[in-house]
């Protein structure tokens, strides 16, 4: 489905981390389809190369960089190379991240530190390098960082919750501090999306049960995340900075007992409590 004009991002240079799978791949493909040159990066070279091949097959322009966002020298080399080849960077999408589910009491110092380094330190290093090497000198640039939508706590994910909250506040703070350089920064709090990870890592029943906890009663499509990022990257997003946009089918607004709003029974009618009729 084509939402935007085909040349919306014509000539823009966009760096997308975690571009090898899921939301990152969908974002890279969408930005390239709108005319941007996409530099996709990630730790595993094969998935990144596959994304680049997909883009090139449909006539887009893309490059792949295998690197770890936690490695500050690799981050510097990434942006130095992009600027040497293209002269500038217009958009950075911080999509790379990761976590594992575990009871809080079972998380080791190493496990907690790893999640913080990947999600917070890595995001900071990518953002700082993009800003100091490109955005601040050219007095223009945009950063979109992908986080998670459960803002009221998610059991088993204390390390990830702490990390994602840090990234959101990082974007808010930098949006004020770097406004004088015309650098705009936003975060997108992502809910549950129908990516290859959820399709291949878990039984189908898991995704179905997850969808039932979403008021809109479905998982998001990766393209729906990509469309929002494309909007922010476009001139339409020029006055958006310092905000956290939640894309999760209203899941973050619901925290009450089962069933969630929107759930229906076999008849298709909304579920409701059977109440005793008053005596006649």
Residue ranges and their predicted role:
Residues 132-136, 176-180, 238:
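Alpha-helical segment proximal to the catalytic Tyr-Lys
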Residues 169, 180, 187, 208-240, ...:
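C-terminal helical subdomain
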Residues 103-104, 108-116, 210:
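Substrate-binding pocket helix/loop in short-chain dehydrogenase/reductase
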Residues 36-50:
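Conserved glycine-rich Rossmann-like NAD(P)H-binding loop of the short-chain dehydrogenase/reductase
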Residues 144-167, 171-180, 192:
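Catalytic loop of short-chain dehydrogenase/reductase
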Residues 13, 20-22:
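Conserved glycine-rich cofactor-binding loop
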Residues 1-4, 241-280:
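Short C-terminal tail/terminal secondary-structure segment
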């Amino acid at each position: 489905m084509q939402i935007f004009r085909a040349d919306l991002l014509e000539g823009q240079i966009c760096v997308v981390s975690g571009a090898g799978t899921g939301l990152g791949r969908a974002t890279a493909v969408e930005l390239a389809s709108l005319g941007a040159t996409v530099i996709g990066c990630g730790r595993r070279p094969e998935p990144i190369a596959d994304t680049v091949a997909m883009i090139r097959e449909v006539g887009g322009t893309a490059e792949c960089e295998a690197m770890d966002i936690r490695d500050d020298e690799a981050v510097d080399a990434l942006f130095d190379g992009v600027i040497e080849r293209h002269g500038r960077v217009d958009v950075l999408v911080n999509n790379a991240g990761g976590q594992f589910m575990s009871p809080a009491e079972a998380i080791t110092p190493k496990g907690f530190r790893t999640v913080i380094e990947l999600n917070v330190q890595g995001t900071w290093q990518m953002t700082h390098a993009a800003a100091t090497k490109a955005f601040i000198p050219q007095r223009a640039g945009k950063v979109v960082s992908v986080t998670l939508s459960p803002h009221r706590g998610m059991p088993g994910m204390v390390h990830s919750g702490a990390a994602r909250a840090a990234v959101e506040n990082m974007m808010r703070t930098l949006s004020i501090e770097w406004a004088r350089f015309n650098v705009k920064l936003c975060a997108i709090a992502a809910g549950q999306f129908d990516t290859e990870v959820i399709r291949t890592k878990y039984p189908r029943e898991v995704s179905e049960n997850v969808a039932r906890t979403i008021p809109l009663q479905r998982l998001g499509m990766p393209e729906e995340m990509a469309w929002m990022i494309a909007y922010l990257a476009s001139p339409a997003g020029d006055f958006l900075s310092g905000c956290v946009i939640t894309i999760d089918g209203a899941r973050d607004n619901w925290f009450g007992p089962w069933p969630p709003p929107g759930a229906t029974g076999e008849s298709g009618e909304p579920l409701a409590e059977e109440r005793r009729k008053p005596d006649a």
